[in-house]
Amino acid sequence: MRTLIATIAVFTAMAAAAFVLTPRAVDACAGLIGSNGSVNLGRTTTLAAYSGGVEHYITAFQFQGGGGEFGSLIPLPGVPTKVERGGDWTLQRLLRETAPVGVGGSGDASGVAAAGGVEVLQEVRIDALDLTVLKGGGADVAVWAEEHGFSLSPDAPEVLDFYATRSPIFLAAVFDAAAAAERGQVLGDGTPVHITIPTDNPWVPLRILGLGKQSDEFVGADVFLLTERQPAWLPAAGDGLFLSYYGQATDLLLDDLRADAGMGWMPETAWLTKLEVGSTAGDLKYDLAVDASGEGRPSFRSAGLIPLPNTGGAEDDASMPWAWLAVAAFAALSISLTGLRLVAGAVRR
């Protein structure tokens, strides 16, 4: 039986993969258990870039050993227009750009009805990855996963519902380690994936990174944002989410990114933000909602900080003015004390 893990990515690359959906015979653990052995998961790195009303979610699936097949599930904010192989150096270049000072194929939309009420929107093969874009409710996606040989962890129904009520779109990725070995992929080799999604604002799933983990297990990830204006986001940087870079992207960086495969859409100017996730799975109950418009009003609902109308509680972001005041004050303090210091460090470089 396959093992299913859920990733960002980020995306982001928004990224990618750090949630473990374990086989029924195995308890949840920090590593991924494949059908023929153990596959270790590294730190997830994701880019969520936003330009012209389109999110470019880029993440990488990395082969780190083991055999058989395993998979991941990435919630998406909308229906992608394209799923293709990502560039060769985009994520690495971003990591280098934001290092601390002094430290050195597109698929066809098929619209095929699948069992359990899930609609298969796209199917794409990239190297040893089989990628499927699904549309359906949380329960339907769970049925689809089990019918395709995956075993779900006990917390999967709650987590899948958490996402499906906001956007019923998921990307299922199946990685065949045996096929990767046949292709000559070695330990540490990664397959970058670039997902193009029209959406009102960029969004990065974070809660999914704790899927299948014990509540006290550590979850770490790097999330890069590239936006045409200075972004605002929820939740504000604080416990478990740390702002490590916030400043205007340099012309050299943008030129380097633009030269990578599939990155010609890169804008002439952009604001670069790096957020680091460092949290226990039990505390990671939110996603990263971004307002890229410059108005400074990211969505509480997209961040998963308020319940949807059918689950009770506040019905929309506008109903929480007190929360907006608190977030504005906290965000301003965070950016003033952390972001500006990081910009100064970037200038010194």
Predicted regions and their residues:
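Bacterial N-terminal signal peptides that target proteins for export
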Residues: 1-11
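C-terminal segment of classical bacterial N-terminal signal peptides
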Residues: 14-25
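Accessory, solvent-exposed terminal regions and/or long lumenal/extracellular loops of proteins
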Residues: 27-44, 51-53, 79, 152-331, ...
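Surface-exposed, glycine/proline- and aromatic-rich loop segments on solvent-exposed faces
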Residues: 42, 49-98, 145-167
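A mature extracytoplasmic/lumenal domain signature
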Residues: 61-63, 130, 135-138, 177
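A cross-kingdom signal targeting lumenal/periplasmic-facing segments of multi-pass membrane
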Residues: 80, 84-127, 135-141
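Covalent nucleotidyltransferase core used to form phosphodiester bonds in nucleic acids
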Residues: 110-117, 121, 135-174
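Cytoplasmic C-terminal tails of single-pass
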Residues: 344-349
